[in-house]
Structures are given as structure tokens and as C-alpha cells.
């Protein structure tokens, strides 16, 4: 039986009569790394603040280990939060910052020292106890903030966009460190970000949010390979999205041509949207291509060229290729049936999951 450490049931949150969360329901299993992913204003940080006890719900229920916690104050919850700005005390050294919560609990000096040293060891800052916060880099401050959170041995660690202020190289390094730390500690992490690459890299499960709703939930691979709708396909990774018609199971038409695919379970001749990822398209000769396009522009992205093409109907196609293309040239695009992903309009996540299971069996 799965142990759901946190559950939301039909949670609504309003600020000044403006709904921020709209009947949100989900379950969080113990010991996993979860990410709330979405654009600014989608409600992801509000969920974090409700779990932490900083915000009340307007209606609905929040459960922790099966017990309703709507009225439980923040200091009585088994959660700790790492904030975007770290919220460290600049007048205290590293030891005193990490020990702050333990001193409030009135633990003995020996126990505090033991726990602080262990927390600093876990975040790879052993021997930094007397270092002043002002003397530390952004990455080191990030680790101190995490140490201060985990020293209290929370059951759930909440992280509110903690990597956003770091440069790209350090942010990438911290992704590895956070993932490794979560696996070593075995506690539940709930991470908030608008950065889809962070979410894909670190998470066991992702909740994609938009306008106060959880639009889709699943593993990073599921979210990337099987987006439920236009928003998810466009927000998570780069996508080419065109209108199409589902002629029958495993046969779809778009840009005036018929293509084999692996999707099914839809009505015959149902209007749909078709997704092809840029990395799944290969530039080839006109004879070998399934689509004919004209190369418009290209940018070198380091690991690949990002090539923008247009087909004869005016649809834009982005291609990721290790080879440079000739601008203005007519070329073919090839792809495999399994590279095509077909999306229905206004399909619920429950219906979407049921349809996938029906033709995966």
C-alpha cells in the first residue's frame, strides 16, 4: 500500500475573491522527489505555502499522514522550507544559522553540535561552522539554507525556486547535489520551479500547473513523451505542433498527407493536434523526406544547430541537428511513426491515462 504523506482534496484558494487554486487534488508519496512546474502565477508557490502552513485554504482539505491539518499551525508541521532568497541571518555565522531551529527546541549543546555537523557534512560543507554568511558564495549559501532545513529532520522538505539566483553552471551542479541529497536522506522533496529542464532532470514525479489547475502529472518521461495538450507540449521542451485529423487508429493526417502513428482510441476523422519534437526530425533529401520544407534560419546552440524551416502550407518546423543546413534550400524531413504524438482537444487527464493504457496493453 502506498504511503501518501500529503494529500490535497478539492483545495480552493482565493486572494481578494480572485481564485488562485481551483479544486486542486493530488497525493504525494513518501520518499520521492516531486516538482510543481508552471509559469508565474499558476499557483505552484501557493500550494507550497499551504503545505507549510503559511497560507490557509479557502475551501477543501489538506492531509498529512492521513490527518487533516487545515488548522495545524506552521511550527507544528513536519515540514521545512528553503526559500528563493535563502532567508539566512546575515549577522550569524554558519553554525548559528543551521542551529537556529534546534536552539528554539531547547536541545542540549552537545546534541545541537552533533546535528549541525552532520547536516553540514550532508551538504558538503564540513568545517564551515565559523564562516560568516557574507564570506560565502551563492552556492555555499544555498547549501547552508538546505542544512538549516534538514537539521530539523522534517518528513517533507519544501523548496521554493531555490536555484533561480544561481548562474547556469552552478545551477546544474546543484541539481545533481539536490537529487543526490534527496536519495541519501530518503525524505520527500517538493520543489517549485518554472524551469522545465530542472523539473525533467531531478524529479520522480512532475505536476504541470496552469491557471490554478494541475494540468498533467506523471514521470518526466511520461510528461515529455506523452503531453496531454497544447500547453504541456509547448511548455515542457520544444515542440512542433500542427493541426491534424485522426483518420483511424494508427493513421493520422496533417499538412495534407497521411502518416502512420502509434496513437489510437479516438473517433474516426476527429480533429486533433500533432506533436513532433525537434530532436526527432532528421533533415534528408527531398526523395527520402516525408515532408518538404524550406530552411529559413538557424542558430548554433553548442550541442546542436536549431534550424527553422517552413513547409508549403506555411507551418513552422524547428529541427535540432548536429549538421549545419543551407539557408534557402529545400530539404526533406524524415521521422518515425513512434515520433508522432497525437493530442485530443479538451481531454481530461483521467480519460487520457485510460486511453494510453488501452492501447499499451
From Swiss-Prot:
Keywords: ATP-binding, Cell membrane, Membrane, Nucleotide-binding, Translocase, Transport. It is a peripheral membrane protein. The keyword RNA-binding does not apply. The keyword Transcription does not apply. Its EC number is 7.6.2.11. One of its GO terms (molecular function) is ATP binding. ATP binds at residues 38-45. SUPFAM superfamilies: MOP-like, P-loop containing nucleoside triphosphate hydrolases. It is found in: Cell membrane. It catalyses: ATP + H2O + polyamine-[polyamine-binding protein]Side 1 = ADP + phosphate + polyamineSide 2 + [polyamine-binding protein]Side 1. One of its GO terms (cellular component) is ATP-binding cassette (ABC) transporter complex. Gene3D superfamilies: 2.40.50.100, P-loop containing nucleotide triphosphate hydrolases (3.40.50.300). Residues 6-236 form the ABC transporter domain. The complex is composed of two ATP-binding proteins (PotA), two transmembrane proteins (PotB and PotC) and a solute-binding protein (PotD). Part of the ABC transporter complex PotABCD involved in spermidine/putrescine import. Responsible for energy coupling to the transport system. Belongs to the ABC transporter superfamily. Spermidine/putrescine importer (TC 3.A.1.11.1) family. This is Spermidine/putrescine import ATP-binding protein PotA. The gene is potA.
Amino acid at each position: 500500500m502506498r504511503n501518501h504523506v500529503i494529500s490535497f482534496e478539492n483545495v480552493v484558494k482565493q486572494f481578494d475573491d480572485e481564485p488562485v487554486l481551483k479544486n486542486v487534488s493530488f497525493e504525494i508519496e513518501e520518499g520521492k522527489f516531486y516538482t510543481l512546474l508552471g509559469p508565474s502565477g499558476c499557483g505552484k508557490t501557493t500550494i507550497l505555502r499551504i503545505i507549510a502552513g503559511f497560507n490557509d485554504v479557502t475551501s477543501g482539505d489538506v492531509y498529512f499522514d492521513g490527518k487533516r491539518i487545515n488548522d495545524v499551525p506552521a511550527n507544528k508541521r513536519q515540514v521545512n522550507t528553503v526559500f528563493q532568497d535563502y532567508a539566512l541571518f546575515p549577522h550569524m555565522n554558519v553554525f548559528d544559522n543551521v542551529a537556529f531551529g534546534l536552539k528554539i527546541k531547547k536541545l542540549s549543546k552537545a546534541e545541537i553540535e552533533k546535528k549541525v555537523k552532520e547536516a553540514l557534512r550532508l551538504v558538503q560543507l564540513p568545517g564551515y561552522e565559523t564562516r560568516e554568511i557574507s564570506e560565502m558564495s551563492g552556492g555555499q549559501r544555498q547549501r547552508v539554507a538546505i542544512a538549516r532545513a534538514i537539521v530539523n529532520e522534517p518528513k517533507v522538505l519544501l523548496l521554493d525556486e531555490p536555484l533561480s539566483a544561481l548562474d547556469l553552471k552552478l545551477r546544474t551542479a546543484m541539481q545533481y547535489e539536490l537529487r543526490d541529497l534527496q536519495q541519501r536522506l530518503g525524505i520527500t522533496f517538493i520543489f517549485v520551479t518554472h524551469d522545465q529542464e530542472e523539473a525533467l532532470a531531478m524529479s520522480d514525479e512532475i505536476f504541470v500547473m496552469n491557471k490554478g489547475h494541475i494540468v498533467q502529472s506523471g514521470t518526466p518521461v511520461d510528461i515529455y513523451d506523452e503531453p496531454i495538450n497544447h500547453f504541456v507540449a509547448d511548455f515542457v521542451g520544444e515542440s512542433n505542433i500542427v493541426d491534424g485529423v485522426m483518420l483511424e487508429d494508427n493513421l493520422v493526417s496533417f499538412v495534407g498527407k497521411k502518416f502512420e502513428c502509434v496513437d489510437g482510441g479516438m473517433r474516426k476523422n476527429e480533429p486533433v493536434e500533432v506533436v513532433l519534437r525537434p530532436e526527432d526530425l532528421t533533415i534528408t533529401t527531398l526523395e527520402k523526406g516525408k515532408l518538404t520544407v524550406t530552411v529559413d534560419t538557424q542558430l548554433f546552440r553548442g550541442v546542436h544547430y536549431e534550424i527553422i524551416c517552413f513547409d508549403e502550407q506555411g507551418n513552422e518546423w524547428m529541427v535540432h541537428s548536429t549538421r549545419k543546413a543551407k539557408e534557402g534550400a529545400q530539404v526533406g524531413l524524415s521521422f518515425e511513426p513512434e515520433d508522432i504524438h497525437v493530442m485530443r482537444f479538451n481531454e481530461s487527464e483521467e480519460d487520457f491515462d485510460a486511453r494510453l493504457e488501452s492501447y499499451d496493453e
